[in-house]
Amino acid sequence: MRAVAVAWRRRARYHGAVPLRVDEQPYPVIASVIDPRSETYRAHEQANRAAAEKLAAALREATVGGGDKYNQRHLAACKLLPRQRVELLLDRDSYFLELCPLAGKDVPGHVPGASLIGGIGRVSGVECVISASESTVKGGAMSELSVWKSTRLAEIAEANRLPSISMIESAGADLPNQSKIFVPGGRGFRELTRRSAERVPTICLVFGSSTAGGAYIPGMSDYTVMVKQQAQVYLAGPPLVKMATGEDSGHEELGGAEMHSQISGVSDYLAEDERDALRLGREIVAHLGYRKAAAPLPRQVLPPRYPAEDLLGIVAPDIKTPFDAREVIARIVDDSRFSEFKPSFGSTLVCGWAHLAGFPVGILANNGILFSESAQKGAQFIELCNQQDTPLLFLQNITGFMVGKRYEQEGIIKHGAKLINAVSNSTVPAITVMIGASFGAGNYAMCGRAYAPRFLFTWPNHRIGVMGGKQLAGVLDIIQREAAAKRGEPVDEQRLAVGKAMVEGQIDRESDPYFATARLWDDGIIDPRDTRTVLSIALSAAYTAPVRGTTSWGVFRH
């Protein structure tokens, strides 16, 4: 079986909105012109299949925790592995969309996944943000990347109003790196209480140690479950208490599950064992009666007319090679139907309406560099989608805005600013998938990470940066030559060539999708063939919160 891009999830098909009746389909069907027999298609398919296999291998690596030695030690202590805890918490045959699964990959001092499992799954019929300490890696100690990932999961829970379930077994902060953790780590406690204040439930299941600052996670959660003879929650363990006060105390009397359940009241439920804790977690979610705040109009959900497998042959592995975004849209939206907006104006930005798993979406997809016309078209389209309370889907493959004397005089800056203004102030849910290049201000205009999309995923061919390595090295070459001319000095061609090669190599490394995802610039690299499934889950999660557009915008320069 092909390893799916959603790093680790239940084997289930996600159907999206429940079809209640067969509606008429007024949108036209996209007519694909792809020839699977062409040499170009076959070359793309071969390269993209290899990239997908590389991704699958990286995702498998991220599921092994601390490795066989520490996993066996964990099992020998009669404990469930962290991923088993997630599996048993989820509804039977449900899904788990793992988020940021490769955070920390190839970053010195870190492991893939950043010692924290996190994602979205259904528990007692309710979509929840689920996190679990990877307790087989340094006892689940939190690094600075663990904190970043935890913060990102909290952002997703808040923006989409999803209940959160934290499964804790952690040695706390990775003390040798405390200077990188202490200040940002405190934000997690603040956000936990803020979600509670906004009536977004927070649940904590404690399977082992949760000490020092980590004790505030169960202390500040709405509901806390502790496992008998395993959970240990205290601000200071026995050695530190002895050193600070001279008092002798044992782990159980100081912070054991029974003490907190019977005496301190920090624990709300005492679980007999780990499976009982998971049962109690499911029971808590069941009694919440949590409901979605929005729902699309019921409609028949039809799969695309073209196979997702085609995406491997359509999309160029080299970002310099263009491809038609409509061919991508045709393979992810319902029945391959798409109502295009202003098709003859600003043609390098494809805009239009479709449905995906029954959810309405307004799609903005790059079909070339952004000109003034395409920027104006995109801004107007975003205004229309906000007027209709329609979520936005950005398919980003952009090298930036057009430059040059003519375009500057035509006002490319002010027109680009209109699009960025619209993206910045839009209030409907936005989801971004980077299906190719993401350079310069094009990243901003197409709702990059800094513009707070609800979710942001990338494909393995993705590249990101201020500009490409060759372009940046070339710019520096021109600048250095001009500087030498001003000083009246000859150019050292050998030194300049070495410098250019070093800069180009650096930029190429830093624009690699694995470099980006390791640093949480996105929510995960996905196999192109899984795009529809991933977007279905993301849209469903977004509809847990109210879906409301705005008519308030910043000043548009005309």
Residues of each region from the PLM?
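N-terminal mitochondrial targeting presequence
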Residues: 1-22
